[in-house]
């Protein structure tokens, strides 16, 4: 809700999702994402009310109302998507596609960076809820994963001109991204890390 309010998209319904992974306890890693989980942007608390529906039910209802038309975008652990599939398996063939920041596949040397605290061979979103990721990966839904292979690669880094354009912009989303870049730079990483860490 904080980010949606920031970009003026309060028309998008948001339900409270799962507070923990499907099976295990939630790991803590405040270093990766900052004290607020958003690169220390510290956005104001939202004033837009959440949907009274749980995120799982919002997913189910949206897919059922629009069969074959909904692309789910997962920027975190896949717990809510997996639970929606478990609760209402009939939605699985109705989902057009899932695009996820998820996993790493060994496609280049950057795929094996130490990006998850003390677990160097794991990507955070899968590390948090591997059981949910397994359900989604094995569901048969068309799945496009942007893993560490893609998101933490110098080829996707921002140029000096890109950063200058962000600095010159008054748009709140540009300021948000610029703070995220400062956050990762202060930790000794390049701007490309914002595509997966923030």
PLM features: residue spans?
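N-terminal acidic, glycine/proline-rich low-complexity segments
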Residues: 1-198
């Amino acid at each position: 809700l904080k980010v949606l309010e920031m970009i003026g998209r309060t028309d998008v319904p948001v339900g409270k999702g799962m507070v923990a992974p499907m099976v295990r306890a939630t790991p803590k890693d405040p270093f990766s994402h900052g004290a607020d989980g958003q690169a220390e942007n510290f956005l104001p608390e939202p004033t837009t009310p959440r949907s009274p529906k749980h995120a799982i039910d919002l997913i189910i209802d949206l897919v059922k109302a629009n069969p074959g038309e909904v692309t789910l975008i997962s920027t975190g652990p896949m717990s809510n998507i997996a639970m929606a599939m478990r609760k209402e398996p009939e939605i699985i063939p109705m989902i057009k596609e899932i695009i996820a920041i998820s996993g790493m596949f060994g496609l280049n040397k950057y795929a094996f960076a130490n990006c998850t605290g003390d677990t160097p061979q794991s990507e955070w979103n899968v590390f948090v809820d591997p059981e949910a990721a397994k359900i989604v990966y094995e569901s048969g839904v068309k799945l496009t994963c942007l893993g560490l292979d893609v998101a933490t690669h110098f080829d996707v880094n921002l140029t000096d001109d890109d950063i200058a354009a962000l600095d010159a912009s008054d748009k709140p989303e540009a300021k948000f991204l610029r703070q995220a870049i400062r956050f990762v730079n202060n930790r000794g990483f390049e701007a490309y890390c914002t595509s997966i860490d923030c």
